Amino acid sequence: MRRDLRGRKVRTIAVFATVGALLLAGCSGDDGDKADPTTTSTTVGSSTPPTTGSSAEKLHILVSNDDGYAADGIDALVQGLGDLDNVDVVVVAPRDQQSGQGGRTTLGPLAVTDVTTKSGYPAKAVAGFPADSVRVALDELKVEADVVITGINAGQNLGPILDVSGTVGAARAAVARGIPALAVSQGSGAPEYQYEVAVPAVLDWVRDHREQLLDGTLDPVVTNLNVPSCAKGQMRGLAEVPTDPDGDATASIGSQDCASTVAFSPEMGEVEAFVNGYATINEVPAEPKTPADVYPAGGATTSTSAG
């Protein structure tokens, strides 16, 4: 069965062997550059679902994000997932940049457009919030999914900012429908977002949980993975730590010191571990603390991530 991270300070620290080499590579491209749609917009009701595999052994992965279908992070994720054996990857993501939207959803029909990611992978672009994209994919397009992976987000999502994250909000929309989800974010603060460092961590997680995902024994929870971007040094390891909703808000959005000499300890919180160069992984609540925490004045069209 799955490892229960709730209520635990630390379960393990594991260093990815490939990180050193990967840090030598850089990411290129601007998330603001949109790929050209290949067809005109349609409404949800008339969209054709993306083709999914039929093999019982094939793992079906739905990918979404909050930075939009043309972002570098989602493209790096999709390319990385292609290295896995016997998987079917479907991309349904927001048409536009939707960071900081939490679990907001839209009432009524939404336009869905056939597009491609930056590298040319087929995708569906939804004219709505991140949680809308997952809702549309699962409820309207009837995409088959054993797991939903959201990201790779441009910027960490941890500590007190967790509940405003569209990356987490989209993952919560999957969990509300009984599907396990992995929310993945790459830290900010280095000259470039090092998405290539997060990809191996995602692939390791999928490989570790593949059989449980296929046989339906992995609990439908949101697993939140944050990977540092290192201006100097290398990612120092992977820390399984509880969420830290009362952590330092300023530090939670700051840079990461991968050259830090601060030793890891079981007393470290999520934010402290991350800013000292550790990737962090934990389970987050399926719902935000209160709607007001996610939807400040001005509000959302709905009050939960379920849609």
Residue ranges and their predicted role:
Residues R2-A14:
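Bacterial N-terminal signal peptides that target proteins for export
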Residues L23-G26:
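C-terminal motif of bacterial Sec signal peptides marking the signal peptidase cleavage site
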Residues S28-T52:
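Short, low-complexity, disordered segments immediately C-terminal to signal peptides
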Residues T43-L62, T302-S303, G307:
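N-terminal low-complexity, Pro/Thr/Ser-rich intrinsically disordered segments
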Residues E57, Q79-S133, E144:
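A cross-family phosphate/adenosyl-ligand binding-site feature
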Residues S64-D67, V92-Q97, A127-F129, G151-A154, ...:
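Active-site-proximal beta-strand/loop segments in catalytic clefts of secreted hydrolases
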Residues D163-G169:
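Charged helix-capping and loop-helix junction motifs
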Residues E196-G307:
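Electrostatically charged, flexible surface regions
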